[in-house]
Amino acid sequence: IKSKPEKQQLKEALLHEQKYLCCYCCNRISDDSSHIEHFVPQSKDSGLSLEYSNLHASCQGENGDMKHCGHAKGNDYDKALLISPLDKNCEKRFAYSVNGKIEPSDLSDQGAEYTIKLLALNDERLKKAREEAMWTAGVFYAQGEKERETLIKQYSNPADGKRVPFCNAILYQLRKDQESAGSK
């Protein structure tokens, strides 16, 4: 897309569709703090350059020499391993510890492991931000099934259309606690 207005419209559509979260780390993004990411790099398949399903909004993911998300991925791409944000099972393939670390839900899931490493999703700043998000959300204070259910609904479908940063980690912990409470 050569035209600035068309590119801007595309970016706004992606931001809205992704509820203003980075397609990889789920941190809050805006027009100024994101870029249009080609999931399959243009260098690997130029035919997908303008394919909407190949385009996502990614955070800038840079802090000095440290990079994460789209900037860490660069032109690396292993079709058999890299998990697409559009994969219907994407969220289920990752687990989050209370200290913000992300890991494969199934430790034998090579795709999840590859994705975490390639995108540097365990960057110290990301881990700390996920941990803070879980504490701020009250994940570890939720008392009872009803309160957990209310929080799950709140973080799944926000009224303003913008999901809370790192809501995937928040929801993971809430659902994990819900399952634990149900098995007692």
Please describe what each predicted stretch is.
Residues 1-21, 45-50:
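Short, charged surface segments at domain edges that flank catalytic/cofactor-binding sites
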